[in-house]
Amino acid sequence: MTLLDLSADDVLNTTRAVRKRLDFSRPVEDDVIRECVATAMQAPSGSNLMTMQFVVVKDAEKRQAIGEIYKQCWAIYSSMPMFAGAIKKEGESEQAQQDRVVDSATYLSEHMADAPALVLGCTAGRVDGAPAMMSASVMGNILPGMWSFMLAARARGLGT
């Protein structure tokens, strides 16, 4: 797949949550996923630990199972006080935008399994029972890599 003719600023300024515009019928070649993962692995890592790993799931049954877990997590999140749908904006247009965000995120929770591939960012080890700061540090360590994966996909014309 050819890279789009985009500057770094273009990629950063045009990478959005495109949940309702994802083309679930568009196949994604393994080589393209590998390129995006290779780019993502160049991301910074706390203490240079490099504990991030990526799991690519293309099997339909496994994608379905992951989609079900995502739906369950979405249901839990949607009952929390910090849920995007619980946030009330001041202006009418701002509230309409917030409602669209919630609508598109709900859509993704219902269609996660429809993606031709799921790429899961993981980190080595577990944080069960660890202090909050350690948990946040370990889990946050994968975020630069996941963002880099999203930017690499965007540079190749793919949504994430």
What do these predicted regions represent?
Residues 40:
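Covalent nucleotidyltransferase
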Residues 56-142:
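Glycine/small-residue-rich phosphate/adenosyl-binding loop
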Residues 141-144, 148-151:
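Short amphipathic alpha-helical face segments that pack within enzyme cores
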Residues 111, 151-152:
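Hydrophobic/aromatic ligand-binding patch that stacks against planar heteroaromatic rings
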Residues 1-37, 49-50, 58:
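Specificity-determining recognition surfaces
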Residues 49-52, 155:
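Short secondary-structure junction motifs
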Residues 131, 153-160:
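Short conserved catalytic/interaction loops centered on acidic-Pro-aromatic/His motifs
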Residues 43-49:
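Glycine-rich phosphate/pyrophosphate-binding beta-alpha loops
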